[in-house]
Amino acid sequence: MISTFALFWALCIVCIINMARYYSSLRVLLLVLRDCDPLLYQYVDGGGFFTSHGQPSKQIRLVGYIYAQRYLDHHDPEFIRRCERVRGQFLLTTALCGLIVISLIAMMIWY
């Protein structure tokens, strides 16, 4: 039988790997955004997005832009493809983090 703790840690590792993939895809999306739509790049603070002085309100704007699928009207197909990829990875990572929290609560109750 598979250990519950081993399964939990495997789930955590998968979640961390997906977070790294999401982070990498978001960086590439910002590079594509800088070339195809400089105004939107400035609107979401693309240059300072991953810095310590980045503005969270502008970062949330980009997340909202992608989550609401407002990118579908964009003129660049590469940008649309990158946004769809980032959106899928965001939803997957969110679901995995939720599953980890639920399994952690279940393990606390069970043991």
Swiss-Prot record:
Principal place of residence: membrane
Keywords: Cell inner membrane, Cell membrane, Membrane, Transmembrane, Transmembrane helix
Keyword Cell membrane attached: yes
Coiled coil start-end: none
Record InterPro entries: Universal_stress_protein_B
Record localization: Cell inner membrane
Pfam families per the UniProt record, alphabetical: UspB
Regions that span the bilayer: 1-21, 90-110
Keyword Acetylation appears in the UniProt entry: no
Example of a GO cellular component annotation carried by this entry: plasma membrane
Protein's membrane topology: Multi-pass membrane protein
Domain of life where this protein originates: Bacteria
Family in the record: Belongs to the universal stress protein B family.
HAMAP family recorded: UspB (MF_01088)
Protein name: Universal stress protein B
Organism (species): Pectobacterium carotovorum subsp. carotovorum (strain PC1)
Organismal lineage: Bacteria, Pseudomonadati, Pseudomonadota, Gammaproteobacteria, Enterobacterales
